[in-house]
Curated annotation (Swiss-Prot):
Its main location: cytoplasm. A motif ('KMSKS' region) lies at residues 279-283. Monomer. SUPFAM superfamilies: Anticodon-binding domain of a subclass of class I aminoacyl-tRNA synthetases (SSF47323), Nucleotidylyl transferase (SSF52374). Its EC number is 6.1.1.16. This is Cysteine--tRNA ligase. GO terms for molecular function: ATP binding; cysteine-tRNA ligase activity; zinc ion binding. One of its GO terms (cellular component) is cytosol.
Length: 486
């Protein structure tokens, strides 16, 4: 069996992964707060840990991996969005507006992540469906002396958990000394954090032993992971921005509520995403939602996925238009190579080895380039599938109704791809290239340049060689632009 090695944030080492139960490998990834469309940075952990999910399924069997990714559907930002609609004159109840907003945002999220080629997790719990489990965990923490109630709030007693800060490498005393925020008067200690907070009458709330209120953010993941994966499970993952305080607080809550378990054995964190070398920000004009890239800029989801996988998850990833263009051109060539090919029975050993070595997706992609250079379409298709690439679903490619290659046409209907034997554009392209050749021989360079500009403008790639002009179709080929030159 393939040995998987993963970098464990908790131990700061790359370790051989040994599941608790090979028949049920368990993975939890923190999901989105569903108040607006997912931005490009939200897509990185989804794609990275989708590759991990695929790898685990390949090694241990599809039915032996349980993957949980939650939706946080109770949050101040969600409330604010619903209140804004209410203030704008919507007559419906705030509860109805919140439900509509969260349902709509989850639908958007699924559309975007499906387009990125991400498999759906085994479970996608909504926080509001697990309030009872959260209340039960909070009651248990109070009974064990790890939490206390003040003025309708329930707070976790941070100093009751001696290992607090171990994941992020922080000292509680140092954090207090460096704090620059006003401490709520009902806290015993500045580091204590909220497990439950009161809700105003107009805001969402649930009855509890401490009055009507709603859960704090951190308790949600602790309760849902316990209910769906147990007190101890294999891997907990998410973005590096969640390492502190969210993941640190999850560990404290879960280990104090269930000391018999160890919570997550392995912690994995993907690094941040930059755009053109800078932090993504609306004020800088470099903030993109995945929907923006797909719909407004016409970048296929598969292209976005390949760019995200081009940098190791443990390093900051820089999104640029140049990387997207390169990925698009590469995937176009690979899709043509594999269009009429059945995948090989197993992936390339070097691709599998790269992914098993701490999800080394850049090395895996480099190997895919080598396989493509050997024109082994069957092996390329099987191997790329481990990275969620070259799937039969076109993953957002916007293609003309018929794409000609030197020997066939790919006809696209919806998301299905079919190969047929006619070549409606080949003769046109070759006729134009022959006219260009004759114009050059006759030293009519104005006309030869016009023909070249016409072909290039239509998305035809031309390479002049001593033996004559060679051509191929680029990813932006549009037969409608194959008019006559001036």
């Amino acid at each position: 069996m393939t040995e998987i090695r993963l970098t464990n944030t908790k131990t700061r080492r790359k370790e051989a992964f040994e599941p608790i139960d090979r028949k049920n490998v368990r993975l939890y990834v923190c999901g989105p707060t569903v108040y607006d469309r997912a931005h490009l940075g939200n897509g990185r952990p989804v794609v990275v840990f989708d590759v991990l999910f695929r790898l685990l399924r390949h090694v241990y069997g599809e039915s032996h991996v349980t993957y949980v990714r939650n939706f946080t559907d109770v949050d101040d930002k969600i409330n604010a969005a619903a209140l804004a609609r209410k203030d704008a004159g919507d007559p419906r109840s705030l509860e109805a507006l919140i439900r509509e907003r969260t349902d709509e945002t989850i639908r958007w999220y699924h559309e975007d992540m499906d387009a990125l080629g991400a498999l759906r997790p085994t479970h996608e719990p909504r926080a509001t469906e697990w309030i009872g489990a959260m209340i039960a965990m909070i009651e248990d923490l109070i009974a064990k002396g790890h939490a206390y109630e003040r003025e309708g709030h329930v707070l976790f007693r941070v100093r009751s958990y001696r290992d607090y800060g171990a994941l992020s490498g922080r000292s509680v005393d140092d954090m207090i000394a460096g704090a620059r925020v006003e401490v709520a008067p009902f806290k015993e200690d500045p580091m204590d954090f909220v497990l439950w907070k009161p809700s105003d009458d107009e805001l969402p709330g649930w009855d509890s032993p401490w009055g009507r209120g709603r859960p704090g953010w951190h308790i949600e993941c602790s309760a849902m992971s316990y209910e769906l994966l147990g007190a101890t499970f294999d891997i907990h993952a998410g973005g590096i921005d969640l390492q502190f305080p969210h993941h640190e607080n999850e560990i404290a809550q879960s280990c104090c509520a269930h000391p018999e378990g160890g919570f997550a054995k392995v912690w994995m964190h993907n690094e941040m995403l930059l755009v053109d070398g800078r932090k993504m920000s609306k004020s800088l004009g470099n903030f993109f939602t995945i929907h923006d890239l797909r719909k407004d800029r016409g970048i296929p989801g598969e292209v976005i996925r390949m760019v995200l996988l081009g940098t190791h998850y443990s390093k900051p990833m820089d999104w640029t238009a140049e990387k997207a263009a390169q990925a698009k051109a590469t995937l176009w060539k690979w899709r043509k190579l594999t269009a009429d090919v059945e995948p090989a029975g197993s992936p390339d050993a070097a691709v599998l080895a790269a992914l098993a070595d701490d999800l080394n997706t850049p090395a895996a992609i480099t190997r895919l380039h080598s396989i493509a250079a050997q024109e082994d379409g069957a092996l390329l298709k099987a191997s790329a599938s481990l990275l969620g690439l070259l799937e039969d679903d076109l993953r957002g490619w916007t293609l003309p109704p018929a794409i000609a290659t030197a020997s066939n046409v790919i006809e696209v209907s919806g998301s299905a791809t079919a190969i047929v034997g006619t070549v409606p554009y080949r003769k046109t392209i070759e006729r134009l290239l022959d006219e260009r050749k004759q114009a050059r021989l006759g030293k009519d360079f104005k006309r030869s340049d016009a023909i070249r500009d016409l072909l290039v403008g239509a998305g035809v790639i031309i390479k002049d060689t001593p033996a004559g002009a060679e051509w191929d179709l680029g990813p932006d080929f549009d037969p409608a632009r194959l008019g006559e030159p001036e």
